[in-house]
């Protein structure tokens, strides 16, 4: 999606880059689709047991995890013989923001932060989510990895993103619930990285020892992290 001006922008503040599913939106929807509804629909379509369907899909998932295929509804429709995008639309009422999502975005907008939405969801999936939870007023850049040609786990994603939308990685912050994505961002040179302790309301909160990066749960906790970055920058400049 093209760059858009949001008005009250402070160029001295870091660009804030957000994942969508499991970060701004509750991952419970995706868990429902991929772990429950797709196995059920697959079993019905192929006249097999639910257990057989779950085993088949699990093998497919493991084969393609963290690739562009993993995030493509078109690919999965062809692979498993179920219209995966239609399946998501059938349960679109389950799409929901995480706690504090709009409270955070409203305040970031008021404070003049530049916010980018970077998702591995394909463009059709991004469109579906935005139709049901309108995040677009808060972001000057909204990117699906399908546009880039690499998923966020790969440093090539960040290289191509920078070519399309120039930015200084040292002046950026990335929030994502997936450690491999944060590793890709870190490899590219983004120093400020945060994860999410409970991406899905349907699963328990992850323990700090399970996570490789600093974590927040309620999204408004991000302000504590941003204040720490600001204070660190002040300390460096005055040293």
Predicted feature locations:
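Asp-based, Mg2+/Mn2+-dependent phosphohydrolase catalytic module
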Residues: 1-16, 106, 122-123, 127-239
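Flexible coil/turn residues that form the inter-helical turn or adjacent wing/linker of helix-turn-helix
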Residues: 69, 111, 178
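N-terminal helical cap/lid subdomain that shapes the substrate entry/recognition surface
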Residues: 6-103, 124
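Short glycine/serine/threonine/alanine-rich loop segments
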Residues: 48, 82, 113, 167, ...
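Substrate-recognition element of Asp-dependent hydrolases with the DxDx(T/V) motif
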Residues: 82-96, 101-133, 141-145
């Amino acid at each position: 999606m093209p760059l858009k001006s949001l008005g009250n922008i402070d160029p001295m503040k870091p660009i804030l880059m957000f994942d969508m599913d499991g970060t701004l939106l509750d991952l419970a929807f995706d868990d429902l689709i991929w772990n429950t509804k797709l196995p059920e629909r697959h079993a019905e379509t192929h006249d097999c047991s639910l257990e057989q369907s779950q085993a088949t899909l699990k093998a497919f998932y493991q084969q393609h995890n963290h690739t562009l295929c993993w995030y493509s509804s078109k690919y999965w429709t062809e692979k498993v013989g179920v219209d995966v995008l239609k399946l998501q639309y059938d349960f679109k009422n389950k799409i929901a923001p995480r706690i504090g999502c709009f409270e955070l975005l409203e305040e970031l907008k008021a404070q003049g932060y530049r916010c980018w939405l970077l998702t591995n969801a394909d463009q059709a999936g991004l469109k579906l989510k935005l139709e049901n939870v309108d995040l677009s007023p808060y972001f000057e850049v909204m990117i699906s990895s399908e546009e880039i040609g690499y998923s966020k786990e790969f440093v090539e994603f960040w290289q191509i993103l920078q070519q399309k939308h120039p930015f200084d990685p040292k002046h950026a912050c990335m929030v994502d619930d997936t450690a491999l994505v944060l590793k890709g961002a870190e490899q590219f040179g983004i120093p400020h990285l945060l994860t999410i302790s409970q991406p899905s309301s349907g699963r328990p909160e992850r323990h700090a020892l399970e996570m490789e990066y600093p974590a927040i749960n309620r999204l408004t906790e991000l302000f504590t992290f941003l204040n720490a970055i600001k204070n660190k920058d002040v300390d460096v400049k005055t040293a």
